[in-house]
A protein has these predicted regions:
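Active-site-proximal loop/turn and secondary-structure-junction residues that shape catalytic pockets
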Residues: 40-42, 65-68, 91-95, 125-127, ...
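Active-site mouth loops of central-metabolism enzymes
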Residues: 4-20, 62-70, 91-98, 198
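Histidine-acidic metal/acid-base catalytic patches
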Residues: 1-9, 18-29, 107-110, 132-147, ...
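Active-site acidic/histidine proton-transfer and metal-coordination neighborhood
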Residues: 67-149
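Conserved beta-strand positions in the central sheet of alpha/beta enzyme cores
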Residues: 37-39, 61-63, 86-89, 120, ...
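Active-site-adjacent beta->alpha loops and helix N-cap segments on the catalytic face
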Residues: 41-51, 96-105
Length: 266
């Protein structure tokens, strides 16, 4: 099966500025994507309801970061956003998950329940909630149907969590979305940890990740990451990642056993 393929809008935020939403959508539609994830700091959130009827693209989620001082900003978006049913939420109140993060979730979840919106916790390297284990603990503590997790291959790899099969088994009850990137551990990467690259680059074996998810029955969408530091032509990078993903997907369907690796430290 072909999974819906989305791209995060970070790829459109370059050193020279940000491509308008209309251009983002035209590029994504032309290069074969089914949707996008929009960052909460976009100046065009009010236009999201036009995206599906005009370009046929789904808004998979709004990506948002909570840190102390952003309570009103985060709450207002959850209360008012149209055109999507998901918030991907990174938590960064300190060096680990703090009471402030939990209070934020306590405030947001009733609103989400009323509006039919999910929160997908977004483990993020060098943030307070870095690991899948921390996200799972929050899901277990809150035990709320509108709370789940994004499994992000990039952040799992950058954090060097290891134990891919075990981490996926642990996350599956709450899995809402999977995000991917080409990446390699490098002090030149994001946060001095790891690069963000098109899917046909890097040392992270995304084919193995796709296979592990397929064996667990994952049928949801995939999101591709981007970042201004990846360089190159934005349109060309979109093409490369889309082609690499569909190639891996097709290969996996024909040869599912190819994705089963001899166990290593990961």
């Amino acid at each position: 099966m072909e999974h819906p393929l989305h791209h995060m809008d970070f790829i459109f935020q370059t050193k020279l500025g940000t491509y308008p939403l209309e251009v983002q959508c035209e590029m994504l539609a032309e290069t074969g994507y089914q949707g996008l994830t929009v960052s909460a700091w976009s100046k065009e959130l009010s236009a999201l309801s036009r995206v599906k009827p005009q370009w046929g693209l789904d808004i998979g989620a709004i990506y948002m970061i909570y840190r102390p001082g952003l309570e009103s900003f985060v709450t207002n978006i959850v209360q008012s956003v149209e055109g999507t049913q998901r918030i991907e939420l990174a938590l960064h109140s300190g060096e680990s998950v703090k009471d402030a993060d939990k209070r934020m979730l306590e405030r947001l979840l009733p609103i989400c329940e009323q509006r039919g919106i999910d929160i997908a916790l977004y483990p993020h390297v060098r943030y307070g909630m870095q690991t899948t284990s921390e996200a799972i603990s929050l899901c277990e503590e809150f035990d709320h149907p509108n709370l789940g997790i994004v499994f992000n291959g990039y952040h799992w790899y950058a954090n060097q969590e290891k134990g891919l099969e075990q981490r996926l088994d642990a996350v599956m009850p709450w899995l809402r979305q999977v995000n991917l990137a080409g990446t390699r551990l490098s002090p030149l990467g994001w946060g001095g940890v790891a690069t963000i690259e098109p899917l046909d680059e890097g040392e992270m074996d995304n084919f193995v990740l796709l296979g592990a998810l397929a064996r667990r029955g994952y049928h949801g969408r995939y999101g591709v990451m981007g970042w201004e530091s990846m360089g190159g032509d934005v349109y060309g990078n979109l093409q490369r990642s889309q082609a690499a993903f569909r190639s891996m997907e097709k290969r996996l369907a024909a040869h599912p056993d190819w994705s089963v690796m001899t166990p290593s430290s990961y």
